[in-house]
């Protein structure tokens, strides 16, 4: 097993995004009606109103996909002999892309407090990508 510090940190950061996106994605699946109603109440007065339902499903699909992708990355770092896992690289990039979409949506809805709550996740993903780049790409 690979227990060097950088692998452990990258594995834990991968698990962080598994938990973050899996919980959110599962919640959207289990409580679809309530979450969709919330999306409609938040974005109903914006230019996104005609496409709220497809956007809701798109975000849900991305959250579930990224959480699965990051689970593979965590496995690579914590349970395999992988010292450099391409799943981690793309996982952090996909996480950042999803977080930027969520941030943009909050800004469009003029929920500035909600948008500011996403910033720590974006910073965490940026730090994780930086660590990955320095550990595996140098």
Language model regions located:
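Extended, low-polarity transmembrane helix blocks
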Residues: 1-27, 57-138
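Solvent-exposed, well-ordered loop and adjacent helix/strand elements within mature globular domains
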Residues: 20-62
């Amino acid at each position: 097993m690979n227990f060097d510090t950088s692998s452990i940190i990258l594995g834990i950061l991968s698990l962080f995004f598994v938990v973050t996106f899996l919980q959110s994605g599962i919640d959207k699946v289990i409580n679809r009606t309530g979450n969709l109603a919330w999306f409609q109440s938040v974005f109903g007065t914006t230019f996104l109103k005609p496409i709220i339902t497809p956007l809701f499903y798109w975000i849900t699909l991305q959250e579930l996909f990224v959480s699965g992708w990051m689970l593979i990355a965590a496995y690579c770092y914590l349970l395999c002999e992988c010292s450099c896992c391409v799943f981690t690289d793309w996982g952090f990039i996909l996480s950042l892309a999803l977080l930027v979409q969520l941030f943009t949506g909050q800004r469009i809805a003029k929920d500035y407090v909600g948008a500011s709550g996403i910033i720590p996740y974006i910073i965490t993903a940026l730090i994780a990508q930086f660590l990955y780049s320095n550990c595996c790409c140098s």
